[in-house]
């Protein structure tokens, strides 16, 4: 029996694939669980339409990411932190701190997209990568400076 997959099925294929399976497997497993539909012209068009919508949505997300990357590239932010008598910084700079500073510049970025291996614990300048989309990233410069009294 030929079916068209409505979801990714491990070992069988991805959404939109037309596969040949035994009738029992299709009727008792794939179709009741919503993983596949019996192959008809109408069902094939339905799945193709869903795939086209998904592709358009992914393209729009990628375009938005490119626009934001253009704005973010070259942005420099300054974060002040208190330092002790020995010159060591109290606390650290995290992705949340960077996100807040970007918001002040009217740039909305989810903190999960900021690629920071570990919190910044020293004063200095750092180039930080912001991964906006699997294919789009930007680099911002973060200056960690002593807090002015």
From Swiss-Prot:
Pfam families: Ribosomal_L9_C, Ribosomal_L9_N
PROSITE patterns tied to this protein: RIBOSOMAL_L9 (PS00651)
GO process terms (BP): translation
RNA-binding listed as a keyword: yes
GO MF annotation list: rRNA binding; structural constituent of ribosome
A cellular-component GO term for this protein: ribonucleoprotein complex
Domain of life: Bacteria
Keywords, alphabetical: Ribonucleoprotein, Ribosomal protein, RNA-binding, rRNA-binding
HAMAP family xref list: Ribosomal_bL9 (MF_00503)
Function: Binds to the 23S rRNA.
Family to which the UniProt record says this protein belongs: Belongs to the bacterial ribosomal protein bL9 family.
PANTHER family according to UniProt: 50S RIBOSOMAL PROTEIN L9 (PTHR21368)
Full protein name: Large ribosomal subunit protein bL9
Top-level taxonomy: Bacteria, Pseudomonadati, Aquificota, Aquificia, Aquificales
Gene name of the encoded protein: rplI
């Amino acid at each position: 029996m030929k079916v068209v997959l409505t979801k990714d099925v491990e070992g069988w294929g991805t959404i939109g694939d037309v596969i040949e399976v035994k009738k029992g497997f299709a009727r008792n497993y794939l179709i009741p669980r919503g993983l596949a539909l019996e192959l008809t012209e109408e069902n094939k068009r339905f799945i193709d339409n869903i795939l086209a919508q998904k592709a358009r949505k992914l393209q729009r997300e990628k375009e938005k990411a490119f626009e934001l990357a253009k704005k973010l590239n070259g942005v420099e932010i300054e974060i002040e932190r208190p330092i002790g008598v020995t010159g060591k910084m109290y606390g650290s700079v995290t992705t949340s701190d960077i996100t807040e500073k970007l918001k002040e510049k009217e740039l909305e970025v989810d903190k999960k997209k900021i690629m920071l291996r570990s919190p910044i614990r020293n004063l200095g300048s750092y180039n930080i990568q912001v991964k906006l989309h699997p294919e789009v990233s930007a680099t911002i410069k973060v200056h960690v400076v002593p807090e002015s009294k």
